[in-house]
Amino acid sequence: RKLFLHASPVPSYYQLHVPFLIWMSEAYRKGYPVQYEAVCMNREKPVAGNASVFHSMLSLGGIQTDYKEDSLSVASKRYVTRPRYYLNDHNLPKLLDKIGLKEKDIKQLEQRKMMYP
């Protein structure tokens, strides 16, 4: 497809589809049922990893701080999905529907039920 890796002006589906995985042991699930239930509740929702990782890790670790935003944590029942952005080759965030994705990449996103836009 003649694309270079990260920060292509117009990315391909393969640059946008980054798995977000959380594994919990049986002991963790029993010890932290609220976080476990929240993760289960949010498991099919789209995640903007760059925005959610920090806040999700705080929630999963039971860390309380003024910096934690529950609406960004997949381990919170207050998690809210947000539009997905792509950081372009000029280091600027652009909405997925504003970057000129190719039709085959849009179809890949839709087939995998990834939020677009």
What are these regions (language model features)?
Residues R1-P117:
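Catalytic domains that recognize anionic headgroups
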